[in-house]
Curated annotation (Swiss-Prot):
It catalyses: Endohydrolysis of beta-(1->4)-linkages between D-glucosamine residues in a partly acetylated chitosan. The keyword Amino-acid biosynthesis does not apply. Coiled coil: none annotated. One of its GO terms (biological process) is carbohydrate metabolic process. This is Chitosanase. The lineage of its organism: Bacteria, Bacillati, Bacillota, Bacilli, Bacillales. CDD domains: chitosanase_GH46. The gene is csn.
Length: 277
């Protein structure tokens, strides 16, 4: 009987230890996920905001293809991947690894040439647009776009946010939307260039002790100015028509919704009216 009581006591302590460990692990994981970016609902809302700006709908447009005459060839898919900048190429490469025999595989040599030359030429991409559109509901094609989007845009946006000391979900969503449109290159219109200009105007970043809300307001000013007067003249007309996306983001800040809670009401003459839950 004594042995049985000892065993019972052992298992009771083991159960308590396991419970404590589980609670600690869960807490650490939740904090890690938040530190790495946005939570699931915040990320969804950020992506839906960008989808409104890019495609006029809260539904992610995997099958979107259009030539915007902005110097970037075809603009495609959920993040506006383009044939001139190499991200459309990366999507097709990732997709081809998953599905070796696909409709887009034959365009890989030309996509590589266009990416290398940063060319907006689409003369040798006959049938590319229709092939891309036809794969809109393909599970692997969607997964390829999601993977490239996270690798090239979402993760870098969260890293830049961490480096700048940004804590609010809205600020991080603004960073994500900015990198989607401006890219994360080293040109004067790039995402990082805008951050550097903002830091100069604000006297530093939130990581340096600058108030995050004031810094974000400065950043939106800088981005607005860049959209109106981009260094890249090929994008000038297209970008000037997109300044309303900054107005929408600023309106969310004015509503003090820095946690990016739903519902978010988007009211825009340029993009229309939407409710993001």
């Amino acid at each position: 009987m004594k042995i049985s009581m000892q065993k019972a006591d052992f298992w009771k302590k083991a159960a308590i230890s396991l419970l404590v460990f589980t609670m600690f692990f869960t807490l650490m994981m939740s904090e890690t996920v938040f530190a790495a970016g946005l939570n699931k609902d915040q990320k969804r809302r950020a992506e839906q905001l960008t989808s409104i700006f890019e495609n006029g709908t809260t539904e992610i447009q995997y099958g979107y293809v259009e030539r915007l005459d902005d110097g970037r060839g075809y603009t495609c898919g959920r993040a506006g991947f383009t044939t001139a900048t190499g991200d459309a190429l990366e999507v097709v490469e990732v997709y081809t690894k998953a599905v070796p025999n696909n409709k887009l595989k034959k365009y890989l040599p030309e996509l590589r040439r266009l990416a290398k030359e940063e060319s907006d030429d689409t003369s040798n991409l006959k049938g590319f647009a229709s092939a891309w559109k036809s794969l809109a509901n393909d599970k692997e094609f969607r997964a390829a776009q999601d993977k490239v989007n996270d690798h090239l845009y979402y993760q870098p946006a969260m890293k830049r946010s961490d480096n700048a000391g940004l804590k609010t979900a809205l600020a991080r969503a603004v960073m994500y939307d900015t990198v989607i449109q401006h890219g994360d290159g080293d040109d004067p219109d790039s995402f990082y260039a805008l951050i550097k200009r903002t830091n100069k105007k604000a006297g530093g970043s939130p990581k340096d002790g600058i108030d995050e809300k004031k810094w974000l307001n400065k950043f939106l000013d800088v981005r607005y100015d860049d959209l109106m007067n981009p260094a890249n003249h090929d994008t000038r007309d297209e970008w000037r028509e997109s300044v309303a996306r900054v107005d929408v983001l600023r309106s969310i800040a004015k509503e003090n919704n820095y946690n990016l809670n739903g519902p978010i009401h988007v009211r825009s003459n340029e993009y229309g009216n939407f409710v993001i839950k």
